[in-house]
């Protein structure tokens, strides 16, 4: 078992990583004493893990869980109402703890509900997808989508604990695992060139769910994320680098319809577009673009946008991106392997050329 601390002063919290952690109630005990507990999960995860978790929490005051539909298209204010209704029906106060049992959608919605209910109650993340384990469960970004933009309604609100049970990956569909690898690869591109090289050399070990390889990859991603969040919790500086590929990627998700492309798939294609943009600007040479592209392909991820999307469709959504400043689209672009920066002086003409040639 590995433990990583997210250092945020009085809001610091541990990330616990290991096998069979959902069967070890002691990890939760100190966070749940004298609390009312509401588990939020979805229709896919509930049959797999809800009973196991409830068994470990049987000595605590657990109320009827909220089971939501599964999918990015359900990450809405309307679906969040189910969480609020349950809390109110149970006369839940600020002594309530929400537990997010699921992937990124469940984690984001549960966190936002926790931030909003009675102006803030505690919550715990138990991420069950690779993408959530290495990215969305750590750092306190909580949100729901709007038809006009992804994650536009939300808050920064930190969990009290993140429990990453790597055994959950054994039930994860291959397509979802690949989507999570897009975020894993991102960390190597923006932060750690040695980690990127390690990923290149361990593709098969990761794809076959080798325990040691998974533990190392997840742990390294969480270490990087914890350091970045500790330095820049609310994304005023270095944390923006974690959005590599996301400006293009969110445009793909919004245009195609949430859930048509998995988030990680859109991030992979978006990251290749960002790398191609950086190459056109002379920030990196073509060999880095090739390495990035080949590694995404090795994990069966898309490396180009949908054929049906044109520049006008991209730019419409990119101009609604949260990083837009004074009307200018700001892109995270690689500057070397393991290094990236934020750029606002990227012409529409260059972007159109990159998208057209993708």
UniProtKB/Swiss-Prot annotation:
What cofactor does its activity depend on? Co(2+); Zn(2+); NAD(+)
Keyword Zinc on entry: yes
User: Does this UniProt record's set of keywords contain Oxidoreductase?
Assistant: no
Q: Which Gene3D superfamilies match?
A: 3.40.50.1970, Dehydroquinate synthase-like - alpha domain
Q: What class of enzyme is it?
A: lyase
Q: How is the cofactor bound?
A: Binds 1 divalent metal cation per subunit. Can use either Co(2+) or Zn(2+).
One GO term of the biological process aspect: amino acid biosynthetic process
* Annotated binding of Zn(2+), by residue: 183, 246, 263
Q: Where does NAD(+) bind?
A: 70-75, 104-108, 128-129, 141, 150, 168-171
Family classification:
Belongs to the sugar phosphate cyclases superfamily. Dehydroquinate synthase family.
Q: What protein is this chain from?
A: 3-dehydroquinate synthase
Q: Which organism is it from?
A: Shewanella woodyi (strain ATCC 51908 / MS32)
Recite the lineage of the species.
Bacteria, Pseudomonadati, Pseudomonadota, Gammaproteobacteria, Alteromonadales
């Amino acid at each position: 078992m590995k433990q990583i601390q997210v250092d945020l002063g009085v809001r610091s919290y541990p990330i616990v990583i290991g096998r069979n952690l959902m069967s070890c109630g002691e990890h939760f005990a100190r966070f749940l004493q004298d609390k009312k507990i509401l588990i939020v999960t979805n229709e896919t995860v509930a049959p797999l893990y809800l009973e196991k978790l409830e068994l470990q929490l049987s000595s605590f005051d657990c109320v009827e869980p909220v089971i939501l539909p599964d999918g990015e298209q359900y990450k809405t204010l309307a679906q969040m109402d189910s969480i609020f209704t349950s809390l109110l029906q149970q006369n839940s106060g600020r002594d309530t703890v929400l537990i997010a049992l699921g992937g990124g959608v469940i984690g984001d919605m549960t966190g936002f509900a926790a931030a909003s209910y009675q102006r803030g109650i505690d919550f715990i993340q138990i991420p069950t997808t690779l993408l959530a384990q290495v990215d969305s469960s750590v750092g306190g970004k909580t949100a729901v989508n709007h038809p006009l933009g992804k994650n536009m309604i939300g808050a920064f609100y930190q969990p009290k604990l993140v429990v990453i049970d790597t055994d959950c990956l054994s039930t994860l569909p291959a397509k979802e695992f690949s989507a999570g690898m897009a975020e894993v690869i991102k960390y190597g591109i923006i932060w750690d060139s040695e980690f990127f090289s390690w990923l290149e050399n361990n593709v098969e070990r990761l794809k076959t769910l080798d325990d040691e390889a998974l533990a190392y990859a997840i742990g390294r991603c969480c270490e990087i994320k914890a350091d970045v969040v500790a330095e820049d919790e609310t994304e005023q500086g270095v944390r923006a680098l974690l959005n590599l590929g996301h400006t293009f990627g969110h445009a793909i998700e919004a245009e195609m319809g949430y859930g048509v492309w998995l988030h990680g798939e859109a991030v992979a294609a978006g990251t290749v577009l960002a790398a191609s943009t950086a190459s056109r600007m002379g920030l990196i040479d073509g060999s880095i673009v090739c390495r990035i592209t080949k590694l995404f392909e090795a994990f069966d991820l898309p490396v180009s946008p949908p054929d049906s999307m044109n520049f006008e469709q991209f730019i419409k959504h990119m101009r609604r991106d949260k990083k837009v400043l004074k009307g200018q689209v700001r892109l995270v672009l690689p500057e070397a392997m393991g290094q990236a920066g934020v750029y606002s002086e990227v012409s529409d003409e260059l972007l159109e050329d990159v998208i057209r040639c993708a």
